[in-house]
Amino acid sequence: MSNVIVLSEDAAEDIDKAVKYYDELSAGLGIEFISTLDIYFSKIAAVPTASAIRYDNVRVKFIDSFPFTIHFTIAPDNLIIILRVFNTHQQPFW
């Protein structure tokens, strides 16, 4: 059985804000951000344990092409819960 990605409300809000920001910056950049996230979500789903545990059983995956990190946990029943998608250039991060 394959892993299933589930977005928390906070992660969905983080993504919405980032897409709006990137679309204001340049037409189509928000879509590129979403496409990049899809690729990284697939990588996480394929091998979730490849990302290191950084704090409180939360794993972090760094995105190469955008200044963001994906924070997630591995739950029972093959669920991967995306907790946050943080912009590493903004403070505070939480």
PLM segments and residue spans:
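Short acidic-hydrophobic surface loop/beta-edge motif
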Residues: R59-I63
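Basic, Lys/Arg-enriched alpha-helical interface segments
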Residues: M1-V58
